[in-house]
Amino acid sequence: MDNHRRTKQPKTNSIVTSSSEEVSSLEWEVVNMSQEEEDLVSRMHKLVGDRWELIAGRIPGRTAGEIERFWVMKN
């Protein structure tokens, strides 16, 4: 039984760690995009859904995180 507790403890810690690393929406910075970028994000989202890496690949200089943050804050 002691081995079971030892192996279970790190899993609990990793869950706590990952949830404590979540970013509150209040801490997000506003992402300003040009009208062209907004249109492209909207069209790409209709085609591929929440595949932010794929969408970011079509918009030079934008990261997947920026695009997702823009989408979440806009919608």
From Swiss-Prot:
One of its GO terms (biological process) is trichome differentiation. Residues 1-20 are annotated as: Disordered. Expressed in leaf epidermal cells, stomate guard cells in leaves, cotyledons and hypocotyls, inflorescences, developing seeds and siliques. Residues 34-71 form the Myb-like domain. It is found in: Nucleus. The keyword Cell division does not apply. GO terms for cellular component: nucleus. Keywords: Developmental protein, DNA-binding, Nucleus, Transcription, Transcription regulation. Disruption phenotype: Increased number or trichomes and reduced number of root hairs. SMART domains: SANT (SM00717). It comes from the Eukaryota. InterPro entries: Homeodomain-like_sf, Myb_TF_plants, SANT/Myb. One of its GO terms (molecular function) is DNA-binding transcription factor activity. MYB-type transcription factor involved in epidermal cell fate specification. Acts as a negative regulator of trichome development, including endoreplication, by mediating lateral inhibition. Promotes the formation of hair developing cells in H position in root epidermis, probably by inhibiting non-hair cell formation. May have pleiotropic effects on flowering development and epidermal cell size through the regulation of endoreduplication. Overexpression of ETC3 results in the suppression of trichomes and overproduction of root hairs, as observed for CPC, TRY, ETC1 and ETC2. This is MYB-like transcription factor ETC3. The lineage of its organism: Eukaryota, Viridiplantae, Streptophyta, Embryophyta, Tracheophyta.
